[in-house]
Amino acid sequence: MTGSTPPILPEHPGLNRLLVFLVHLFTASGTFFSLLALVAAIEKHWPQMFGWLAVALFVDGIDGVLARKLRAAETLPRFSGDILDLVVDYLGYVLVPALAIATGAILPPSLEMPAAAAILISSAIYFADRQMKTENWYFRGFPAVWNLVAFYLFLLRPDPRVALAIVVAFVALTFLPVLFIHPLRVKRLRPLNITLASIWSALAILTLVRDFSPPAYVTAILSLIGVYFLLAGLLRPKTSAPA
């Protein structure tokens, strides 16, 4: 949101500040949903865990829109929405999924905790990277969306050695100059990206309802959409800057 955009209620600055603070509270509510997901993970109720992570993901998907609409950084500069977002995201995108990957019979038993440590540490470093995003909203390196990696590992249940290789690959991609697309904010193919993300969300909910035993076609579509978003940053036009 540009500085020339007027506040929502220019004649009521106090109300604007209250609205921004309420948006920050809404963002912070993601910590509670992540806690509920953590409890479910400890109890090994995996569909329930992913369900709460989905609620946290929904909050994360719309709070930024509200904050930009209200010009949160200018209206209430005391509180950093960016820092708050990172705190909330680390819980839901990294900590809870790392626990699930480590305790969900996904990896070779002797390497579960080392893999979880690699996930947690690499993601913490990534979240501290001031250059994690390009000007056009691509992510530099794997953006630590371990909630999605965990979802696919639980859905596909590959051989533990293959699962370990996948985890190692994404940890390595965290630090490599590879671009990953933001499905909502990157302008290129945005209608397609939003459509695919919506289809993915609906099928993911069906998968959770079916306790990770969806019809084969659902698994196939989810996998194809996942591959698309994984490669979308790599397949962007090379003749211009990311768009």
In which residue ranges do the predicted regions lie?
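Alpha-helical transmembrane segments of multi-pass membrane proteins
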Residues: 53-60, 118-126, 170-177, 222-229
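Short, amphipathic, aromatic/basic-enriched membrane-interface segments that mark the entry/exit
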Residues: 15-25, 79-87, 132-141, 183-191
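C-terminal ends of transmembrane helices
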Residues: 65-74, 122-137, 175-184, 231-239
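Helix-coil boundary and interhelical linker segments in multi-pass alpha-helical membrane proteins
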Residues: 36-52, 87, 91, 95-116, ...
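C-terminal membrane-associated helical module and adjoining short loops/tails
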Residues: 1-9, 139-243
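Active-site-proximal cofactor/substrate-binding loop regions of enzyme domains
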Residues: 10-72
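Cytosolic, membrane-interface loops and tails of multi-pass inner-membrane proteins
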Residues: 2-14, 62-81, 137-140, 243
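Multi-pass membrane catalytic core of lipid/isoprenoid biosynthesis enzymes
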Residues: 23-28, 69-126
